[in-house]
């Protein structure tokens, strides 16, 4: 079972990002996503309403090699996956963990990015599912689960 997105809908929270996720604070994101046809930029979840550089925590499911998985409105800090198109029509277990210095991103047990980054996350007015805060980058696919923690939780390989 999963939430289905057609690219037309989005769901906006009536609560803010926790105050514990500010500046360069640790966080962990986990999601199960299925996308039948992956476009260049599809936003699964935008956790920040900010539009400024390095103030963004946006989980993306797109083919853009620079920022198709995680977007921080940076350049170096963003992360994509050149082989994303091969995951069309398959369930993806996406896991992002940031300890305040190193951000590691895994898809289906494979480490696809690991970088030393600096973020400047500001207080956020809301979180949005299905599009980014600018109401762009519509997501068309399925979201089975989405979790966000305000702590660094190291990745552990999935057991089948």
Name each model feature, range by range.
Residues 6-69, 102-103, 134-138, 148-159:
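Extracellular glycan-recognition modules
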Residues 16-19, 80-86, 116-118:
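Beta-strand-rich interaction surfaces with strong enrichment in secreted/lumenal proteins
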Residues 68-93:
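Short, aromatic/His-centered strand-loop micro-motif at the edge of beta-sheets
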Residues 90-104:
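Localized edge beta-strand/strand-to-loop motifs within extracellular or lumenal beta-rich domains
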Residues 115-143:
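Flexible glycan-contacting loops in extracellular carbohydrate-active proteins
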């Amino acid at each position: 079972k999963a939430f289905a997105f057609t690219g037309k809908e989005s769901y906006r929270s009536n609560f803010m990002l926790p105050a514990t996720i500010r500046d360069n604070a640790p966080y962990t994101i986990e999601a199960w996503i299925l996308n039948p046809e992956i476009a260049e930029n599809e936003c699964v979840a935008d956790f920040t309403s900010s539009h400024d550089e390095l103030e963004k925590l946006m989980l993306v499911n797109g083919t853009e090699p620079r920022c198709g998985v995680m977007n921080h409105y940076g350049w170096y800090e963003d992360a994509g996956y050149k082989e994303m198109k091969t995951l069309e029509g398959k369930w993806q277990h996406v896991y992002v963990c940031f300890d305040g210095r190193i951000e590691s991103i895994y898809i289906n047990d494979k480490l696809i990015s690991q970088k030393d980054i600096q973020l400047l996350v500001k207080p956020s007015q809301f979180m949005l599912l299905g599009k980014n805060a600018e109401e762009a980058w519509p997501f068309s696919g399925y979201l089975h689960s989405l979790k966000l923690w305000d702590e660094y939780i190291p990745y552990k390989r999935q057991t089948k």
